[in-house]
Amino acid sequence: QGVSSAASDVYKRQYIMIGMLVTGVAMVCGLMFYVVDRNVTQKDNFMEIGGERKTVQLPSCRVLKLTQPPVVWKQKKEGIVEAERMFSFGEVPLEVTAGDSLQQGSFSYAGDMEAFMSMTSVGDTLLVTFDFPEDKLEQHLQNDIWIRVRSEGMELRLPAEVQAVVVDVEDMEANFYGLRCDTLSFRTRYLARLEDCHVTALAAQAQSLHLNSGTVRNLYLNLDEIADWDVNTGSFHIDTEHLSGSRYHRCLLQKNECRRVFWTPLKDDASLSVELKQAVKIEVGE
């Protein structure tokens, strides 16, 4: 009986070990399937747009706006909206520079992008619209909600008359280089950088704003529209910062960032808390 009991215990332990081994193998296989499936999904939601680089001349305009339909709703049953589709341009940076020696404007991009864009003039505004209808999507993208557009960077050379640039495109970085003008305003959905820009009066609006090099005499910022902003005080110089907002805001003024700050509350309960690194003249408007 003792021998039989011992043998039974051995068999039980073997069964337990085999069960644990099978469970472990199943878990590893499941994890590998998840990782592979996740990587395939991440790769598959890229929309690659190539083609020979193309440059088109821009007509005269005062406002230049890049835009896209913000969402596309998929309706599979009458009255029922099941999903939305968005196109991210995080892989397509935009460079904004001055026009050529004749101060003419142009727009450069990958040639195949032309199938998904259009240019129209409305008054003094030039609209560049990016649109991706479902019948132009590859089969593997037609069930995706979030599609990432991947293409070479775009270059926008501004006509001399342009006073405002709007980049109303999801996740597109806008990099402003070498601009020299009296007045300019820009608005972007995402990130904006300024390099070697010299502007007398600049109104800037971006989710994330980085002033890296250049000069601005009067900088206008509505803090309601900016999540974060920074100034490289070693290479970017500001005379007066005109700050506004409709709620409570805080800001840090670095040493040598500016000479004066003018705060304009947009509501009665709006306020600005300022941390100073050196003496700065601060004025409050009504």
Feature locations, PLM:
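N-terminal leader/targeting segments
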Residues: 7, 21-27, 46-50
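Single conserved hydrophobic/aromatic residue that forms the stacking wall/gate
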Residues: 1-11
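Sequence-level detector for tyrosine residue identity
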Residues: 9-11, 15, 34, 40, ...
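Short intrinsically disordered, low-complexity coil segments enriched in acidic
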Residues: 5, 15-17, 213
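Hydrophobic membrane-insertion alpha-helices, especially the h-region
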Residues: 15-34
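Extended, compositionally simple hydrophobic/Ser/Thr-rich segments
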Residues: 63-64, 72-73, 147-286
